[in-house]
């Protein structure tokens, strides 16, 4: 059974399809690809698994070619973005082009940003193959590449035409990548939906064993929340900032440790625990809530402490470059209960230092 969710953004609205064997479903894709020139962007890990399958599905719609990039967050940069532009220009692709992101969050972010920039904007489609990209980065139109001084600092808001989530891709996903995706799944429960958080607590083994029904429910619920938030606040002027729970600390970990050494979801897990500990220090939540958050991350084999090599100074230098900083003030998304969060703009650095040093 295929589930459909709509992201309501007026003229830029688009559907999300969630189910099995969707990469072979030419009927769903046909309206977006007919008489188009198609460039599939993927990586060296995904290409041997799924590239031929998706090429065969799309071959009847128009000219299909591909570009295969290295796999990893450390390659999400301007140099490898240029490889996509070169592939388009060498083939004389015009505004009738459609870019297809076949891969995880790195591929989706880069392909979307390339689509936003190429000839001032061409269509693109998201086909996310990792749990993290299925529940988070493929939905909402955030596209970007990293800079050595900060994560996702060069980018644009640019919405896809459609998101195709084929749950069968998760059967080939390494366990570490699956766990990293669960960090974002858990995040939705903490910041938005207490019932969903409790459901996750009760369904750890079903999810870890890749039970299809459990996966479809978890992915669908995350996409419903993301679609709701994005429909209210496309460009992150308000409520969408709550989706960054754990990310200010997490991005600091990724940048300090070197992109690719910690997976994004791993950094988000540790960052969310730091956010919860900060909230406890400020009297926003009690120890029992912190304990539930830590236990659920731990159940999915995720890190719940920051790297030992990182001290307060190494965190704060990156946190001051965070995109949410306003007027020089670090703004943090902190949980105020299971199922609720808020943005706080005046968190004392002394509190942050105490939390980081004691973590």
From Swiss-Prot:
It is found in: Cytoplasm. Binds 1 divalent metal cation per subunit. Can use either Co(2+) or Zn(2+). It holds the Pfam family DHQ_synthase. The keyword Aminoacyl-tRNA synthetase does not apply. GO terms for molecular function: 3-dehydroquinate synthase activity; metal ion binding; nucleotide binding. One of its GO terms (biological process) is aromatic amino acid family biosynthetic process. Zn(2+) binds at residues 184, 247, 264. Its cofactor is Co(2+); Zn(2+); NAD(+). One of its GO terms (cellular component) is cytoplasm. Pathway: Metabolic intermediate biosynthesis; chorismate biosynthesis; chorismate from D-erythrose 4-phosphate and phosphoenolpyruvate: step 2/7. InterPro entries: Dehydroquinate_synthase (IPR050071), DHQ_synth_AroB (IPR016037), DHQ_synth_fam (IPR030963), DHQS/DOIS_N (IPR030960), DHQS_C (IPR056179). NAD(+) binds at residues 71-76, 105-109, 129-130, 142, 151, 169-172. It catalyses: 7-phospho-2-dehydro-3-deoxy-D-arabino-heptonate = 3-dehydroquinate + phosphate. The keyword S-adenosyl-L-methionine does not apply. HAMAP family: DHQ_synthase (MF_00110). PANTHER family: 3-DEHYDROQUINATE SYNTHASE, 3-DEHYDROQUINATE SYNTHASE, CHLOROPLASTIC. Catalyzes the conversion of 3-deoxy-D-arabino-heptulosonate 7-phosphate (DAHP) to dehydroquinate (DHQ). This is 3-dehydroquinate synthase. It comes from Shewanella sp. (strain ANA-3).
């Amino acid at each position: 059974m295929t589930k459909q969710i709509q992201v309501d953004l007026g003229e830029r609205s688009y559907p999300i399809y969630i189910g099995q064997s969707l990469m072979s479903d030419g009927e769903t894709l046909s309206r977006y690809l007919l008489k188009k020139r198609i460039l599939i962007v993927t990586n060296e890990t995904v290409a041997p698994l799924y590239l031929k399958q998706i090429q065969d599905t799309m071959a009847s719609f128009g000219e299909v070619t591909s570009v295969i990039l290295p796999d990893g967050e450390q390659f999400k940069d301007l140099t490898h973005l240029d490889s996509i532009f070169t592939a388009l220009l060498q083939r004389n692709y015009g505004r009738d082009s459609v870019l297809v992101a076949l891969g995880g969050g790195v591929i989706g972010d880069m392909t979307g940003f390339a689509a936003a920039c190429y000839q001032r904007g061409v269509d693109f489609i998201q086909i996310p193959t990792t749990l993290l990209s299925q529940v988070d980065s493929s939905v909402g139109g955030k596209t970007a590449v990293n800079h050595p001084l900060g994560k996702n600092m060069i980018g644009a808001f640019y919405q896809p035409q459609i998101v195709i989530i084929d749950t069968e891709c998760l059967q080939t996903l390494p366990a570490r990548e699956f766990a990293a995706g669960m960090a974002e799944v858990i995040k939705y429960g903490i910041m938005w939906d207490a019932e969903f958080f409790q459901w996750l607590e009760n369904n750890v083994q079903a999810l870890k064993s890749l039970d299809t029904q459990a996966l479809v429910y978890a992915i669908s619920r995350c996409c419903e929340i993301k679609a709701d938030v994005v429909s209210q606040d496309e460009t992150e002027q308000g409520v969408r900032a709550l989706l960054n729970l754990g990310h200010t600390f997490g991005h600091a970990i990724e940048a300090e440790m070197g992109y690719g050494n910690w997976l994004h979801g791993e950094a988000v897990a540790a960052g969310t625990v730091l956010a919860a500990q900060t909230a406890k220090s400020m009297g926003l939540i009690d120890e029992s809530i912190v304990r539930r958050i830590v236990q659920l991350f731990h159940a999915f084999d995720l890190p719940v402490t920051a790297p030992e090599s990182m001290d307060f100074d190494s965190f704060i230098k990156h946190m001051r470059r965070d995109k949410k900083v306003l007027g020089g003030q670090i703004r943090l998304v902190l949980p105020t209960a299971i199922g609720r969060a808020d943005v706080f703009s005046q968190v004392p650095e002394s509190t942050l230092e105490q939390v980081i040093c004691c973590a």
